[in-house]
């Protein structure tokens, strides 16, 4: 019954690149037994609103994308909630926790370190593994035209390289659908351009402002984050509370590659808050 659903704490799930809210298809049903689960497409992705990038790519800043999600939760009458974000969704969730401190009860981020730290600690090894961070931020329309020449190849390359050749099944077509649309492809590039410009400005201003909420980090054993960053140590710099971290036997796309562990870890973390 609807009344029973609203007795459970709300949990917002946010996806990453190059995916949509469908990346949670293996985890959301099980999590909905314990939480009121909300899954949403980030601005510009999937079936969400597409806006022009604006000056300094501000319309795709994580601040604006975080506002979208808070407005969505307000519309659903959720004044306070848990949030878990993978990849780009993790960056939006991090900004949300900073800008809307009274709304976020606890935060889980999957397979990322803070944007500021990743750029400041860029090495040759990181640049080779995450070349898209430097490709997608190039001025429009260079990356857009190159990807649009063969969007299927681009999506397959991203999914295969970052997962270690995981089989995504039919959901891969849904991810590809977005990248066949010029406006959405452009929006996804604007997301990255914002991260290298306006987002860094916001992050630098907040560098010394610590969060006061429980934070969990999950990273893939075979992913770049686990190999190149001390995730717990880095995230702990941003929090007054103990940061909990767990390595998952997975590549980058943890919710699809190891859904059982993701369900277990999210449930364990959020239910104890």
Residue locations for each model-derived region?
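Short amphipathic alpha-helix adjacent to the substrate-entry channel of hydrolases
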Residues: 22-38
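Catalytic active-site module of serine/aspartate enzymes centered on a nucleophile-bearing elbow/loop
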Residues: 242-273
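Flexible "cap/lid" subdomain of the alpha/beta-hydrolase fold that forms the substrate-access gate
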Residues: 7-10, 23, 38, 45-84, ...
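Active-site glycine-rich loops that stabilize anionic/oxyanionic intermediates
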Residues: 8, 16-19
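Short, small-residue-biased leader/transition segments that mark boundaries at the very start
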Residues: 1-6
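Hydrophobic residues on the short alpha-helix immediately C-terminal to a glycine-rich phosphate/catalytic loop
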Residues: 27, 96, 265-269
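A short, glycine- and basic residue-enriched loop/turn
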Residues: 20-21, 251
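Structural cue for short, hydrophobic secondary-structure segments
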Residues: 13-16, 39
């Amino acid at each position: 019954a609807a009344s029973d659903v609203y007795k459970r704490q709300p949990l917002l799930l946010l996806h990453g690149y190059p995916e949509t809210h469908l990346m949670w298809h293996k985890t959301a049903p099980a999590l909905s037994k314990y939480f009121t689960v909300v899954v949403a497409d980030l601005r510009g992705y999937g079936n969400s609103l597409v806006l022009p990038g604006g000056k300094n790519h501000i319309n795709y800043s994580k601040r604006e994308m975080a506002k979208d999600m808070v407005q969505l939760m307000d519309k659903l009458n959720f004044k306070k909630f848990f949030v878990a974000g993978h990849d780009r969704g993790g960056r939006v969730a991090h900004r949300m926790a900073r800008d809307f401190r009274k709304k976020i009860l606890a935060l889980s981020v999957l397979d990322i370190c803070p944007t500021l730290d990743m750029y400041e600690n860029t090495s040759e090894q990181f640049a080779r593994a995450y070349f898209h961070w430097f490709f997608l931020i190039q001025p429009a329309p260079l990356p857009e035209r190159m990807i649009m020449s063969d969007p299927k190849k681009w999506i397959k390359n991203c999914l295969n390289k970052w997962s270690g050749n995981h089989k995504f099944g039919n959901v891969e077509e849904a991810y590809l659908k977005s990248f066949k649309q010029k406006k959405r492809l452009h929006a996804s590039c604007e997301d990255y351009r914002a991260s290298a410009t306006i987002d860094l400005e916001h992050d630098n201003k907040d560098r010394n402002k610590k969060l006061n909420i429980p934070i969990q980090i999950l990273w893939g054993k075979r992913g770049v984050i686990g190999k190149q960053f001390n995730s717990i140590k880095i995230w702990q710099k941003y929090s007054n509370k103990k940061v909990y971290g767990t390595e998952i036997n997975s590549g980058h796309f943890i919710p699809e590659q190891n859904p059982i562990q993701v369900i277990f870890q999210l449930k364990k973390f959020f239910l104890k808050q």
